[in-house]
């Protein structure tokens, strides 16, 4: 039973383990205000961002944000966007934030795309 529990915990952490906040295309900044973490992303690429997936974990809490832009709504180079907020509850400290996927208007893609959200977006662009 312990082996199964360990496997479940390990598999649930894989997207965070394989992702990184060191994305050269989309910089994510987090700020804390009491028990709320605010995430802001900035397009650091030379091309507009069409889609992204960001995952944050703190303690046992995990949240995923995704965005796919319509034509004219792309995140232009240098622009920032509020990704979202996460209630940390009783946990304190900094969340582990991962950029799982980014897709640019020029066709460039970046990230391990380990979450279901990233896989769905990637499939959408292949059509």
Segments the model singles out, each with a brief description of its role:
Residues 64-68, 84-127:
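Terminal connector regions
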Residues 17-19:
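Boundary at the C-terminal end of the N-terminal hydrophobic targeting segment
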Residues 47-55, 65-67:
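Short, hydrophobic/aromatic beta-strand segments
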Residues 3-14:
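Sec-dependent N-terminal signal peptides
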Residues 39-48:
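Asparagine-centered strand-capping/turn motif at beta-strand->loop junctions
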Residues 31-38, 96:
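Short, solvent-exposed loop/turn segments enriched in Ser/Thr/Gly
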Residues 71-80:
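Short proline/glycine- and polar residue-rich coil/turn motifs
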